[in-house]
C-alpha cells in the first residue's frame, strides 16, 4: 500500500477497517487543498460553529507550510518540494515508484503552483476570520499573502509566465526550467495571483505553443522544443 512509500509519521493505520490514511511526504499541496475544501463546505452549510472549531487547525497547517524546514525555504521565502513534474507526486529518481519520502539528499525545488495555492489559502483564511469577526487576524493573513506574492513574482515570474521549478540544492536535468510552461500556470490565474495583463500573458503563451508543437499538450514542451517541432 501507499503507506509503505512514506515514513511512519506520514500515515495512520486503521487495522480494524483494513484502511490507512497516508500523506505522501513529498507533496506540498495538502494543507492548502484542505483549506480550499473547507471553503466549499462552509459556503454550502454556513455552519459558523463548525468553522470556529476547524479554523485553528486550518491555520496551523498553513503556518506549518510557511515555517517547517522540510516545507519552507527561508532564503527565498517560498514553499519547496522534491523535484517533481509540476504538482505530481513522484520524482525522476530510480526509486520513485516506491519512495515518496523527503530524504536529506532529496533534490529540492520551488514550484509556483504550491505557492499560489498557499497564497490562495492565506486569503481564504482571512475571509474565514472576517466572517467570524476576527478583523485583526484577517488582516494579518492578507499581509502575509502579499509578502508571499511578492516572493513568487521575484523568483518565479519570467515576464511572461511562471517558470516550472527553481532548483535549490541541485542543477536539475537540463537548462530549460525558465522556459518550461507547466500546467499550474492556469491554477495561478484561478487562485487570484495574477492581474489581468499577467493572466493574458500566460494564456497567450499557451495559445502560441499550441500552434508551434505537436506534443500531446502545449504545457508539456519548452519553448525550444516547440521551435524544434516547427523546424
Regions found by a protein language model. Give the residues of each.
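Aromatic-rich carbohydrate-recognition surfaces in CAZymes
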Residues: 1-81, 111-115, 119
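Flexible glycine/proline-enriched surface loops and loop-helix/loop-strand junctions
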Residues: 18, 100-111
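Short, solvent-exposed loop/turn segments at the edges of secondary structure
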Residues: 27-30, 85-87, 181-185
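Polar/charged alpha-helical tracts
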Residues: 49-52, 105, 135-136, 208
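Catalytic cores of carbohydrate-active enzymes
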Residues: 69-81, 110-111, 117-229
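Alpha-helix boundary/capping detector
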Residues: 84-91, 171
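A short, charged helix-loop
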Residues: 88-103
Amino acid at each position: 500500500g501507499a503507506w509503505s512509500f512514506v515514513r511512519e509519521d506520514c500515515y495512520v493505520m486503521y487495522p480494524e477497517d483494513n484502511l490507512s490514511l497516508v500523506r505522501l511526504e513529498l507533496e506540498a499541496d495538502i494543507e492548502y487543498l484542505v483549506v480550499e475544501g473547507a471553503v466549499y463546505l462552509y459556503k454550502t452549510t454556513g455552519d459558523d460553529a463548525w468553522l470556529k472549531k476547524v479554523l485553528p487547525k486550518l491555520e496551523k497547517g498553513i503556518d506549518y507550510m510557511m515555517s517547517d524546514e522540510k516545507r519552507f525555504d527561508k532564503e527565498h521565502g517560498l514553499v519547496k518540494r522534491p523535484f517533481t513534474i509540476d504538482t505530481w507526486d513522484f520524482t525522476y529518481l530510480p526509486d520513485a515508484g516506491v519512495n515518496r519520502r523527503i530524504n536529506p539528499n532529496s533534490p529540492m525545488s520551488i514550484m509556483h503552483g504550491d505557492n499560489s495555492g498557499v497564497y490562495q489559502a492565506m486569503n481564504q483564511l482571512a475571509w474565514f476570520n472576517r466572517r467570524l469577526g476576527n478583523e485583526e487576524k484577517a488582516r494579518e493573513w492578507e499581509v502575509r499573502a502579499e509578502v508571499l506574492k511578492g516572493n513568487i513574482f521575484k523568483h518565479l515570474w519570467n515576464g511572461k509566465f511562471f517558470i516550472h521549478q527553481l532548483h535549490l540544492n541541485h542543477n536539475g536535468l537540463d537548462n530549460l526550467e525558465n522556459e518550461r510552461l507547466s500546467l499550474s500556470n492556469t491554477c495561478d490565474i484561478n487562485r487570484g495571483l495574477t492581474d489581468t495583463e499577467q493572466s493574458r500573458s500566460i494564456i497567450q503563451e499557451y495559445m502560441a505553443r499550441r500552434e508551434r508543437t505537436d506534443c500531446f499538450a502545449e504545457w508539456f514542451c519548452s519553448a525550444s522544443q516547440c521551435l524544434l517541432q516547427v523546424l
